[in-house]
Amino acid sequence: MSFLQDSSFFSMGMWSIGVGAFGAAALALLLANTDMFLSKPQKAALEYLEDIDLKTLEKEPRTFKAKELWEKNGAVIMAVRRPGCFLCRAEAADLMSLKPKLDELGVPLYAVVKEKVKREVEDFQPYFKGEIFLDEKKKFYGPERRKMMLMGLVRLGVWYNSFRAWKGGFSGNFEGEGFILGGVFVIGSGKQGVLLEHREKEFGDRVNLLSVLEAVKKIKPQTPASRQS
């Protein structure tokens, strides 16, 4: 009789542990899909961005200050998380859909990458047809770099973004560093400042294209008179 009581008590104990473990896992999954544990991006001041050193990707690279990109006409700049990532390729293609309108407004579209691995940049160019530059010190990914690692595997937004990119026919590889999150900037001409700063909160977090266009329309191209003032 005592054996049956012990067995029943043991079964109830194991059932309670199982329910508790399931509840803890469900709570962890729920919390992982909120923004509670995501690192908050630090806004990049114009002065910080202006002083970033970029390199061209030619055989004989030229180093220049990033402000050259937007000084006259402003610019839209994509900080690419990883060129070989199919999510990044989908983001780039999405942004490229604005190229005709940007050309009409006279605003250039650029991308920066944090490393040049094998042919990753060349293989990225079919999705992004603007000029691409190297940001070796990863300054466009700061001032405080944010990473997403294992949490990305359990976030529903990442799975949705992945499905959307896969359904769109995008594919990729695992070459290069892909944990440091990227973003998109719209920067006005001269000292007009940062008009839009989109920081990825998770893998495949695309910028709102209407927000990009709204910000671009605020750019005031520099004239000889405004450059002298």
Swiss-Prot record:
Keywords: Antioxidant, Cytoplasm, Redox-active center, Secreted. It is found in: Cytoplasm; Secreted. It comes from the Eukaryota. InterPro entries: PXL2A/B/C, Thioredoxin-like_sf. The keyword Secreted applies. One of its GO terms (biological process) is regulation of osteoclast differentiation. The active site is at C85, C88. GO terms for molecular function: antioxidant activity. Residues 14-112 are annotated as: Thioredoxin fold. CDD domains: PRX_like2. It holds the Pfam family AhpC-TSA_2. The active site cysteines correspond to the redox-active cysteines of peroxiredoxins. Belongs to the peroxiredoxin-like PRXL2 family. PRXL2A subfamily. Involved in redox regulation of the cell. Acts as an antioxidant. Inhibits TNFSF11-induced NFKB1 and JUN activation and osteoclast differentiation. May affect bone resorption and help to maintain bone mass. Acts as a negative regulator of macrophage-mediated inflammation by inhibiting macrophage production of inflammatory cytokines, probably through suppression of the MAPK signaling pathway. This is Peroxiredoxin-like 2A. It comes from Rattus norvegicus. The gene is Prxl2a.
